[in-house]
């Protein structure tokens, strides 16, 4: 693989960023009380990447997580973990938990949201939330009451502490309604006071855990036998943002159009298993590589968030019981090679793996996302 402006300078804008990952080697990041941050930083240095560890959080461990964030902040201030450029949460406010451990999906109360938001001052850079978390189809709905504030209160609170909502884990009940909620949250984020730098809104991985009109992945040998004919029918070269609502569905269309407008930094996986590589490459081109981040969803061991995982002979994904995808296994370097094999040139590849992330999280180049100037 050709090196794409890679250096070993701490937080250099050219250092690739593992934006959303769950575990390196045998370490499950969600076991944060025992997480050796200095050792993890050393591992990142060996791989020549910056990293935003993404953790799952159980409700009864919020106080422990606050202590962890204090420890993270102290090490950052001391300059001991320069490669760990932020911490992220997946959840807890998820309408559909998908591969997320069910015990880590919960609806915080007003006071719990205030505690979570304050962690932005210590380095919490985003938390995955579902725009449709408060709809009747949400898995959280039956447990909601007047103690639980809605998104019109939550989003401005997060903005005030520099914590980005990362949109994902949609139900499939009302695609059009969910797309409207995406636009509502983006509008709200851009209208709110923002104390951070870079992107105000990001996403979980595009095409995963959301309602779709297309088959986005071919994970078994039987599915792969039909891949070429399926993709030919999709006519990827003629996809446009204007038609994406009909092609892929209202939710991916809303995300892709907001990203192309520079109002979202969108994440997409290039392992070829979460999303087919041809679809991923076309989507990134439509949104603009300067508005798109390659995320790995990586876990190196058969355990995540306290749950045991397994793999199959068909692909390298990690699965929960019941055949639900929980995480990927391919590191950033492998996914960079995948993107290159799809014809992504050096300059846009650098944006996918480094430039967009450093702008989005305010760790490198100018803060505002670029409006896509690429083919629509």
Task: Indicate residue ranges for each PLM-predicted region.
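N-terminal hydrophobic targeting/anchoring segments and the immediately downstream early-domain regions
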Residues: 2, 9-15, 43-49, 71-75
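N-terminal glycine-/serine-/threonine-rich phosphate-binding loop
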Residues: 2-6, 30-42, 152-156
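Divalent metal-dependent hydrolysis catalytic cores, especially in the metallo-beta-lactamase
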Residues: 18-24, 37-66, 81-96, 120-139, ...
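Active-site mouth loops of central-metabolism enzymes
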Residues: 21-35, 99-108
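Glycine-rich anion/phosphate-binding loops
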Residues: 28-36, 62-73
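Histidine/acidic residue-rich metal-binding segments in metalloenzymes
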Residues: 74, 106-267, 274-292, 337
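His/Asp/Glu-enriched, well-ordered alpha-helical/loop segment
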Residues: 214, 219-268, 282-375
């Amino acid at each position: 693989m050709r090196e794409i402006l890679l250096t070993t300078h701490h937080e250099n804008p050219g250092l690739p960023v593992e934006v959303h990952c769950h575990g390196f080697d045998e370490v499950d990041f969600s076991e944060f009380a025992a997480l050796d941050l200095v050792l993890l930083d050393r591992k990142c240095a060996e791989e020549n990447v910056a990293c935003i560890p993404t953790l799952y959080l159980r409700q009864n461990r919020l106080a422990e997580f606050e202590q962890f964030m204090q420890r993270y902040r102290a090490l950052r201030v001391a300059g001991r973990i320069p490669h760990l450029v932020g911490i992220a949460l997946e959840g807890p406010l998820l309408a559909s938990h998908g591969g997320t451990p069910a015990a880590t999906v919960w609806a915080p109360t007003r006071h719990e949201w205030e505690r979570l938001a304050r962690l932005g001052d210590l380095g919490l850079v985003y938390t995955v939330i579902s725009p449709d978390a408060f709809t009747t189809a949400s898995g959280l709905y039956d447990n909601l009451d007047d103690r639980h504030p809605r998104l019109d209160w939550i989003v401005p609170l997060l903005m005030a502490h520099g914590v980005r909502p990362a949109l994902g884990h949609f139900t499939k009940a009302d695609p059009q309604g969910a797309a409207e909620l995406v636009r509502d949250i983006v509008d709200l984020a851009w209208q709110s006071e923002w104390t951070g730098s870079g992107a105000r809104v990001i996403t979980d991985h595009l095409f995963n855990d959301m309602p779709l009109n297309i088959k986005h992945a071919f994970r078994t040998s039987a599915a792969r036998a039909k891949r070429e004919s399926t993709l030919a029918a999709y006519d990827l070269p003629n996809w446009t943002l204007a038609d994406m609502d009909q092609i892929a569905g209202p939710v991916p269309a809303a995300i892709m159009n907001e990203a192309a407008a520079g109002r979202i930094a969108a994440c997409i996986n290039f392992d070829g298993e979460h999303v087919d590589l041809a679809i991923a490459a076309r989507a990134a081109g439509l949104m603009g590589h300067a508005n798109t981040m390659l995320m790995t969803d990586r876990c190196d061991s058969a355990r995540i968030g306290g749950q045991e995982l397994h793999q199959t002979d068909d692909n390298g994904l990690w699965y929960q019981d019941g055949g639900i995808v929980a995480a990927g296994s391919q590191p950033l370097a492998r996914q960079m090679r995948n993107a290159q094999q799809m014809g992504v040139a050096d300059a846009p590849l650098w944006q996918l793996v480094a430039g967009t992330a450093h702008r989005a999280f305010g760790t490198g180049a100018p803060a505002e996302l670029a409006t896509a100037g690429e083919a629509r």
